[in-house]
Curated annotation (Swiss-Prot):
Keyword list, A-Z: Aminoacyl-tRNA synthetase, ATP-binding, Cytoplasm, Ligase, Metal-binding, Nucleotide-binding, Protein biosynthesis, Zinc
EC number: 6.1.1.16
A GO CC term assigned to this protein in UniProt: cytoplasm
GO biological process: cysteinyl-tRNA aminoacylation
Positions of Zn(2+) binding: C29, C222, H247, E251
Protein name (Swiss-Prot/TrEMBL): Cysteine--tRNA ligase
Amino acid sequence: MELYLYNTLTRRKEKFEPLNPPYVGMYTCGPTVYNYAHIGNLRTYIFEDILKRVLLYNGYIVKHVMNITDVGHLTSDADEGEDKIEREAKKERRTAWEIAEFYTEAFKRDIKKLNILEPDIWCKATDHIKDFIDLILILEKKGYTYKTSDGIYFDTSKVPDYGKLAGQDLENLLPGARVEYNPEKKNPTDFALWKFSPKDVKRQMEWDSPWGIGFPGWHIECSAMSTKYLGQPFDIHCGGIDHIPIHHTNEIAQSEAAYDKPMAKYWLHGEFLVMGEKRMGKSEGNFITLSDLEEKGYHPLSYRYFCLTAHYRSPLRFTWTALESAQRALFRLYENMKRYPQENASYDKKYEEEFHKAINDDLDMPKALAITWELVKDDQVPPEVKRATLLQFDKVLGLSLNNPPEIKIEIPEEIWKLVEERELARKNKDWEKADKIREEIRNKGYIIEDTPQGPRVKKATPLTK
């Protein structure tokens, strides 16, 4: 079955034809490890995981590379400001190396909780300084660089189609809102390949180079590491839509200038997670982490399910109500799976074909989820066949349907004492006291349900409080 993907570079949905079938080289921009990933970041990684799973589902052999930006990402997202990791190190009174290691491991824990398949290759920027210098030397030899007082810059005026990814030409490209003005630049869009360490300042992360002591620019990192592990051109480059106007535009410019060939054949970008009227982001001060969701009683896979309810190229509005609905739907799926007999059976070919068509149509996960529920509700399909078909779907959905997680929530001792006190009041038919205790339990963040088997306590969500 043919697979179609929307290519940002050509602005159209295209039939996927890898450069060297059945092998696929895929590079995804990883985290800048100065803080916890927020759930907006994680939406992008879930989209990329779905893409990878769809490729595998279609029989491709995927080599997936993801970088870890542990140096060089400045607060402006381009060439000015403080290194985000060094800034955080000062704030937390730890070394930059400790900060990077701590948040790298936190990120890996998050993606494991979300059932995101790990890349085949993790590549840390600090392990590839020589590769960055070698690429800058190639660009220097070909006449694409110039020196300023604070670093070595790439001259974007020498690239006729600079800005093609964003659909703008050089004259119409203004420096992005998060790019600070540098009067020494030849063009506002020029970007740093190598930044010099400030005079009389000893940075924690700095290296010697042919141009002086300093550190790499953010954009050169992805160009050098993707080429090292995947060659050039490679098949697929992914990221968030915020990467299009600056980061990915600059990657293309320097990579294609260096090697005189396209960087990647297909460029895919995930839309923002929106909260209120703004996109979720650390710079906006409105971000939520996966741990925040867990503390409120949501399972990480409920967030994964929530992300599947919208197409990756559509903004997704985050609300607690929507997340609560996603969790309920996921738990219903788990309950159905537990009821189905674990017998050997073949999957339903009609439903599998519909599901396959949906995922191969530019990763149409909302439609794939709708087909999933049609199957669950179809009384004509035997339960053991439903189970086999859902397990087939889960190769892409990634919801752990074969092994539904046990939802365990620790209830504090003080809550259990209140439950016992309430049970005693109910036994004595002191309904007023029982109601007051129920309200007290609710105010402490838990709700109590009376069942024939006795009281059941669970953590309240923002919806049930």
